[in-house]
């Protein structure tokens, strides 16, 4: 039964009609897995947001806009009008829905993009793609919208980031030719390198907010995957400082999970 949604049988050929309903023992887990695959636009419930949190989240958006302006490169400037439009799009589509980490979705997206800005400030397309990727992944915003409203370079980045399901796939053969050409590769907007920046920024942000997750196995998996795969990728292709940040965040996340598990076990015993 664990492999199916359930079983339903009606007994109508009896004096008292009865209904037999059989559900898998892990029905709640199955339901949660099904719901997480749905675009959040399909999930109508929004979590309560205090006036302070709402004000803080709007401040995050404004600070990100100012942050981007400071990092804009003369040779290939970031279009602040495009950034403003993307921030508005985030608010419209995400509303006050939350990520599994407990963060408001649009606050999380901006936090990830902020890391991308710090790492690849002279590549505007990668920054735009880091904002659009989460929209396409988690909402009903179609890829065709990205293709029609942004240039094909941005579309290609979003498409390639969406194509990564497992972090093992980040170690793409095309990255082998980079060697010590990181700065040149960023300027040339090498697609797989851009994908790596976005995915590792996403991972670093989520690990840093591990305390907000309620499903601890998910955090443990992220942390272990980071230590075995992501840290090596960052050290090999990007910057040792990024690798160090990922390792530190992963180890801290594992400690958070361990402490939470101990508290939960203690509560059960009491």
What are these regions (language model features)?
Residues 2, 6-270:
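Active-site helical microenvironments for divalent-metal-assisted chemistry
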């Amino acid at each position: 039964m664990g492999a199916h949604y359930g079983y339903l049988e009606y007994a109508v050929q009896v004096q008292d009609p009865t209904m037999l309903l059989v559900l898998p023992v892990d029905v709640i887990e199955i339901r949660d897995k099904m719901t997480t695959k749905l675009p959040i636009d399909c999930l109508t419930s929004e979590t309560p947001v205090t006036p302070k949190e709402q004000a803080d989240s709007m401040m995050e958006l404004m600070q990100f806009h100012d942050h981007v302006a400071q990092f804009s490169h003369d040779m290939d400037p970031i279009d602040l009008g495009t950034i403003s439009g993307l921030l508005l799009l985030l608010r419209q589509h995400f509303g006050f829905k939350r990520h599994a980490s407990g963060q408001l979705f649009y606050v999380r997206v901006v936090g990830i993009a902020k890391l991308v800005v710090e790492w690849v400030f002279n590549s505007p397309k990668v920054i735009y793609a880091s904002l659009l990727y989460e929209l396409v992944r988690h909402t009903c915003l179609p890829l065709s919208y990205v293709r029609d409203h942004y240039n094909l370079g941005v579309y290609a980045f979003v498409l390639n980031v969406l194509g990564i399901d497992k972090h093992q796939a980040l170690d793409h053969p095309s990255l082998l030719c980079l060697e010590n050409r990181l700065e040149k590769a960023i300027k040339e907007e090498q697609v797989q390198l851009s994908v790596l920046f976005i995915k590792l920024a996403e991972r670093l942000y989520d690990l840093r907010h591990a305390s907000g997750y309620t499903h601890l196995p998910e955090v443990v998996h992220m942390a272990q995957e980071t230590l075995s795969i992501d840290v090596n990728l960052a050290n090999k292709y990007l910057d040792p400082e990024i690798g160090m940040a990922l390792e530190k965040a992963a180890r801290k996340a594992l400690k958070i999970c361990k402490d939470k598990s101990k508290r939960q076990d203690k509560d059960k015993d009491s």
